């Protein structure tokens, strides 16, 4: 009998031992820390031109030792960083996630407002009241939080509020962005931790002020810059981040100087260290926004010493960031991904100077002419109630009062708009929303970029080389290319250097991250995981 029980015990122990080994061998391996690097204005051409000037541990480490998605394109129309970032983080398009641009025309109050504006929230350190309430889909950061409630930690450090909120989604512990009037870190009460204590400490102990008041001069001798080859009399520049953008403005140039990038790195590293990100087997995430924009720039291409210097200094910041992450967490335990927004290689100004057809489309005069045309057809009324982001809004109430055929009025506007310089097409919104068939077509890309909650009644597109500008002459989106490519790199963790030439779209990034982290994909995700550079379970 003893022998019988001994045999049973040994058998159970054996199977338990085997099961334990199998469980260990099939245990999911995940990166302990995910670091997202979003760079406003980043272009692959710039990285290539400056490659010989970069340090080995910054951009070069990511581009040479990482995975280069060489044919990654945006499958939405360029309308600002908010929609670009939301599309990357959700794996979806504005048709589903709702973020159609940095701003939109609010039909309820007949005004253009920020996509993140929310009067139900409070600002912390700022009068801005913002949230992610218009982001209608979960993000990969949200899914990480939901997969590991109260365990996965996620933070965002950004230069601008729109970028901060879209990177943070709905569930980040805290997001922080730069206030370039009062020169401090600020946030919104929408996120549960409010202003994180590291940002608050920098505001109080002078750390923010120290970095934000650094005078910006060339990093190297001015004649060594590429810009000097086009201008032998190129003079050294000097900027003070606290100087005003214009004579009557309270806003400073801080956000378009290297000081902004230094602030992001400094706070990001403080959060990683003090919050112990990446210290256990539960993945954490930190999203960082940088910029290569310069004060008062008119060109998207690399034409100024200031632009070069922004890249060269950011290269050193990224090198320092990676060195510190390697020390504190280990780059073999960290997954880094780096991407930019949609930006044309050349601005309309530059194209025009080289006799290439291009221009800026301003809606103010155009809408006045459209309204005059409709008055000639239907009577002296205000037929246009608003316009923004290639969306024309008609006065539905007045059209109904006059018992007019709404679709006929829509078509009249479409026909008239085709005569405007720079306009490629004009379509009734119902027609755009109903587009199907080839998902790669220009009309499908337009349909992806529209959401029923914020769409106008007529939607236009512009000719190649043309960009829309608002009433302050600020671009509304910065790319009008039929296919808009963006640099995108993965680096670290278990990845080997590789160039992926297979065409992918930015909606494929979130599902790829989800698969690597072994978490559910965002709930509106339409992309597919990129399979070339890693083995998924």
Residue ranges and their predicted role:
Residues 43-49, 72-74, 126-132, 251-258, ...:
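Second-shell loop/turn segments in exported
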Residues 69-89, 156-164, 289-291, 335, ...:
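Short, solvent-exposed turn/loop segments enriched in Gly/Ser/Thr/Pro and often Arg
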Residues 54, 80, 102-129, 137, ...:
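Secreted, luminal/periplasmic, and some membrane-associated catalytic domains
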Residues 24-67:
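Active-site-proximal N-terminal segment of extracellular/periplasmic enzymes that hydrolyze or transfer
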Residues 46, 254-280, 293-334, 513:
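A long, amphipathic alpha-helix that forms part
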Residues 92-93, 101-282, 291-298, 421-425:
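His/Asp/Glu-rich, glycine-adjacent segments
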Residues 364-405, 475-517, 531-536:
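Substrate-binding rim/cap in mid-to-C-terminal beta-strand-loop elements of soluble/periplasmic
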């Amino acid at each position: 009998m003893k022998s019988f029980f001994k045999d049973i015990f040994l058998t159970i122990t054996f199977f338990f031992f085997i099961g334990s080994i199998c469980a260990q061998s099939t245990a999911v391996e995940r990166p302990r820390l995910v670091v997202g690097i979003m760079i406003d204005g980043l272009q692959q051409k710039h990285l290539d031109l400056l490659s010989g000037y970069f340090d080995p541990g910054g951009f070069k480490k990511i581009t040479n030792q990482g995975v280069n998605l060489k044919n990654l394109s945006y499958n939405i129309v360029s309308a600002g960083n908010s929609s670009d970032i939301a599309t990357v983080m959700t794996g979806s398009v504005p048709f589903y996630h709702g973020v159609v641009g940095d701003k939109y025309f609010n039909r309820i109050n007949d005004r253009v407002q920020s996509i993140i504006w929310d009067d139900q929230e409070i600002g912390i350190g700022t009068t801005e009241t913002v949230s992610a309430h218009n982001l209608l889909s979960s993000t990969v950061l949200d899914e990480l939080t939901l997969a590991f409630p109260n365990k996965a930690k996620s933070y965002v450090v950004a230069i601008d509020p729109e970028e901060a909120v879209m990177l943070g989604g709905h569930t980040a512990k805290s997001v922080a962005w730069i206030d370039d009037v009062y020169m401090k870190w600020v946030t919104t009460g929408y996120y549960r931790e409010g202003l994180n204590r590291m940002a608050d400490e920098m505001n109080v102990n002078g750390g923010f002020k120290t970095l934000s008041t650094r005078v910006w001069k060339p990093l190297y001798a001015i004649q060594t810059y590429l810009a000097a080859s086009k201008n032998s009399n190129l003079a050294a520049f000097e900027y003070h981040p606290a100087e005003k953008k214009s004579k009557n403005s309270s806003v400073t140039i801080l956000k378009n100087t290297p000081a902004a990038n230094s602030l992001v790195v400094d706070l990001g590293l403080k959060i990683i260290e003090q919050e112990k990100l990446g210290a256990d087997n539960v993945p954490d995430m930190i999203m960082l926004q940088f910029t290569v924009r310069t004060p008062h720039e008119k060109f998207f291409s690399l034409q100024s010493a200031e632009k070069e210097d922004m890249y060269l200094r950011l290269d050193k910041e990224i090198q320092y960031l990676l060195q510190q992450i390697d020390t504190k967490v280990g780059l073999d335990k960290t997954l880094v991904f780096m991407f930019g927004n949609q930006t044309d290689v050349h601005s309309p100004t530059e194209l025009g100077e080289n006799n290439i057809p291009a221009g800026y489309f301003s809606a103010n005069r155009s809408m006045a002419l459209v309204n005059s045309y409709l008055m000639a057809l239907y009577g002296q009324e205000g037929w246009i109630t608003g316009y923004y982001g290639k969306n024309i809004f008609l006065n539905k109430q007045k059209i109904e009062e006059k018992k007019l055929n709404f679709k006929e009025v829509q078509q009249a506007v479409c026909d008239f708009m085709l005569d405007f310089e720079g306009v490629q097409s004009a379509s009734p919104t119902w027609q755009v929303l109903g587009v199907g068939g080839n998902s790669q077509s220009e009309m499908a890309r337009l349909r992806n970029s529209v959401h029923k909650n914020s769409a106008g009644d007529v939607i236009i597109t512009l000719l190649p080389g043309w960009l829309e500008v608002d009433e302050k002459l600020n671009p509304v989106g910065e790319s009008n290319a039929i296919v808009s490519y963006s640099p995108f790199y993965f680096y670290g963790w278990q990845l080997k250097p590789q160039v992926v030439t297979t065409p992918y779209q930015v909606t494929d990034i979130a599902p790829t991250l989800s698969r690597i982290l072994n978490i559910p994909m965002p709930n509106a995700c339409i992309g597919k995981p990129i399979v070339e550079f890693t083995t998924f379970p």
